[in-house]
């Protein structure tokens, strides 16, 4: 009797706990099970080129799905449906076991059989559509629809998937999408995204403009039963807000042509090389309008097929890209930091003229080599070191390039000439520009500062100075470091875009325009919301940007606080030197490019430019044992603009391991310029 009484007491206490003490908790749980929040998918914005060519869009993707609650109750009938569906969509009826710890189900990615997915979904949310196979073709989708009566519980859902019509030609600009990664799931949920389904930008414009392109999902708050079936709306649904569209400054016609020209040139030389070490592996072409900073083309090679990453990111393909030493996922145009070679002589020339290190008419002797005493500090007795001109690299031209004035020193790209301007040389050039002033002019012309272009992962580049070398490498600055930096070698690095900006600034007489790759932001109906106006960083002939250094200070590169501008005539003389490179120098008679820039001259389009051959010794060259003193491998550079009197396009070409700028990079630039003016003429004929 006592035991029975005790049992009643325990029961009464438990009932009291359930009905009174735990009432609120149980009601909260019941409410959570009864009320559900559903996301209404938005439409991602479209990306266009400047002429409305579609570069990124949404297209329908067809997924074969099952709704477990609608499948026949009879297991035999289910199996027959699964068997017939399996034959149509090439997915096994039975495969694997779904286990949240070891083999979880992930829509569109899991390798599980139809029966396993159906059983898992039936125990999870039987009224929720679950993909069996994603991205089936339209014909297969229609056949499934036709069998709707025979296959209850089997259907097709249509979901948007990203499509990139221009593929490899623009993938380094446009980028691609990927799943929301765990670190930002909560943040993205707060913005209305569904981490189980929605994707975000992983690279390029897709990443940089995620907030504008992504839009915002709508929401429905609904009452559901225990199986997940929607019973009713609890409030008026909030409509989805579509993403904004973006119109770029890129002209896809020029972009595609520049890509083809670069690949053609690389393949041409690779077919003729004698050793594997001479293979050219990657390159960049960028074209810009120097008047407003609009980027007309930006090619980074090798590229990748972003359409292969549109539905899911295949592990094998992504691993292949990530393991590739040429880094195809990297936009080399803005992220590569490489030695720039003789294109940097533009900077040294501007600085030397403005600081009166040399006059334009002054004659400088340029033998095949000069011997300098390399010193690390004021009283250092130094060590003799030879500095060789490019024409005497193999010792066959000890006479060098002769006696040169400034115009021809730049046109012929004499190393010895610019060694003397940068570091000084005996009584001929008593006081060289020096590394402090050289760095100041480089920064003024766009080096060592990431350009404000609307792309991710834009690199800084490096203009070294004594403090940097002491802190970073634990070494003192030497006079030899200054000589080498004066010709863009040694520790000087930059991105191809920075090199292009320096030349574009000179072409415009000192106006440095910030580069832009975005022209307009539009709403989903095509109405312009924002137009990106040209942005002048500074006019170097008006805005004082060059620091004046305290020559009495014990510290290196100590500024006085005063700034000065660059005289307009300086840019005109540098322009004349770049023009002479085409008519007399490394882009003309000294070039191996036939017919060369004469093609443009014949059409009444005078051009100006500068070549560069940049020796390098990176981890890849070191691993191959190629960093032999005096025989380092080299990158190829050329930058040019046209027409000379009123520039409307400037182009840079960079070829990794390209050996020589005049032979390899110059023809690329010339052909891109030709293509631009042919497109322009064609548009004029059509009245555009």
Where are these regions (language model features)?
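Membrane-proximal periplasmic segments of bacterial cell-envelope enzymes
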Residues: 1-240, 252, 263-284, 290, ...
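Short, flexible loop/turn segments with low-complexity composition
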Residues: 682-688
């Amino acid at each position: 009797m006592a035991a029975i009484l005790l049992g009643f007491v325990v029961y009464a206490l438990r009932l009291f706990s359930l009905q009174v003490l735990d009432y609120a908790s149980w009601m909260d749980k019941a409410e959570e099970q009864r009320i559900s929040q559903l996301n209404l998918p938005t439409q991602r914005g479209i990306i266009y080129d400047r002429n409305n060519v579609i570069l990124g869009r949404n297209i329908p993707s067809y997924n074969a799905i099952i709704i477990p609650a609608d499948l026949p109750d009879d297991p035999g009938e289910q199996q027959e449906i699964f068997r017939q569906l399996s034959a149509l969509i090439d997915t096994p009826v039975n495969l694997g076991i779904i286990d949240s710890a070891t083999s979880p189900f992930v829509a569109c990615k899991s390798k599980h059989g139809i029966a396993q997915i159906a059983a898992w979904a039936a125990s999870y949310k039987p009224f929720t559509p679950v993909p069996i196979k994603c991205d089936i073709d339209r014909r297969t989708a229609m056949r499934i629809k036709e069998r709707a009566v025979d296959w209850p519980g089997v259907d097709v859902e249509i979901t948007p998937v990203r499509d990139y019509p221009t593929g490899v030609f623009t993938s380094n600009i446009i980028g691609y999408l990927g799943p929301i990664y765990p670190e930002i799931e909560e943040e993205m949920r707060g913005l209305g995204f569904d981490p189980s389904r929605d994707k975000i930008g992983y690279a390029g414009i897709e990443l940089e403009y995620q907030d504008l392109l992504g839009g915002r999902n709508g929401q429905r708050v609904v009452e559901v039963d225990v199986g997940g079936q929607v019973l009713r709306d609890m409030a008026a649904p909030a409509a989805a807000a579509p993403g904004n569209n973006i119109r770029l400054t890129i002209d896809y016609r020029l972009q595609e042509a520049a890509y083809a020209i670069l690949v053609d040139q690389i393949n041409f030389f690779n077919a003729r090389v004698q050793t594997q070490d001479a293979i050219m592996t990657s390159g960049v072409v960028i074209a810009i309008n120097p008047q407003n900073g609009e980027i007309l083309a930006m090619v980074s090679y090798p590229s990748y097929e972003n359409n292969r990453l549109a539905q899911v990111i295949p592990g094998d393909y992504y691993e292949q890209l990530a393991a590739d030493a040429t880094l195809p996922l990297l936009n080399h145009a803005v992220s590569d930091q490489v030695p720039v070679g003789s294109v940097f002589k533009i900077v040294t020339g501007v600085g030397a003229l403005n600081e009166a290190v040399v006059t334009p008419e002054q004659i400088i002797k340029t033998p095949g080599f000069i011997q300098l005493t390399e010193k690390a500090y004021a009283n250092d007795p130094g060590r003799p070191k030879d500095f060789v001109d490019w024409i005497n690299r193999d010792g066959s031209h000890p006479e060098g390039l002769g006696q040169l004035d400034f115009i021809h020193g730049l046109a012929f790209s004499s190393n010895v000439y610019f060694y003397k301007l940068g570091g000084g040389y005996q009584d001929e050039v008593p006081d060289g520009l020096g590394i402090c002033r050289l760095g100041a002019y480089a920064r003024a012309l766009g080096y060592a500062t990431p350009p404000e272009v609307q792309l991710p992962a834009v690199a800084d580049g490096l203009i070294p100075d004594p403090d940097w070398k002491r802190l970073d490498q634990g070494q003192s600055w030497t006079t030899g470091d200054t000589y080498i930096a004066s010709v863009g070698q040694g520790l000087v690095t930059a991105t191809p875009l920075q090199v292009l900006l320096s030349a574009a600034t000179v072409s415009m007489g000192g106006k440095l325009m910030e580069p832009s790759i975005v022209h307009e932001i539009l709403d989903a109906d095509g109405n312009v919301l924002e137009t990106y106006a040209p942005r002048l960083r500074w006019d170097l002939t008006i805005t004082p940007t060059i620091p004046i250094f305290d020559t009495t200070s014990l510290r290196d590169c100590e500024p006085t606080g005063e700034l000065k501008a660059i005289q307009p005539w300086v840019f005109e003389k540098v322009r004349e030197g770049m023009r002479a490179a085409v008519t007399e120098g490394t882009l003309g008679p000294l070039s191996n490019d036939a017919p060369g820039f004469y093609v443009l001259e014949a059409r009444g389009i005078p051009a100006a430019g500068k070549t560069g051959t940049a020796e390098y010794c990176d981890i890849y060259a070191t691993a191959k044992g190629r960093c032999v003193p005096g025989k380092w491998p080299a990158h190829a550079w050329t930058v040019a603009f046209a027409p000379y009197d009123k520039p409307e396009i400037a182009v840079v070409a960079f070829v990794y391991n390209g050996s020589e700028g005049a032979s390899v990079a110059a023809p690329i630039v010339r052909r891109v310029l030709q293509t631009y003016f042919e497109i322009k003429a064609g548009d004029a004929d059509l009245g555009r």
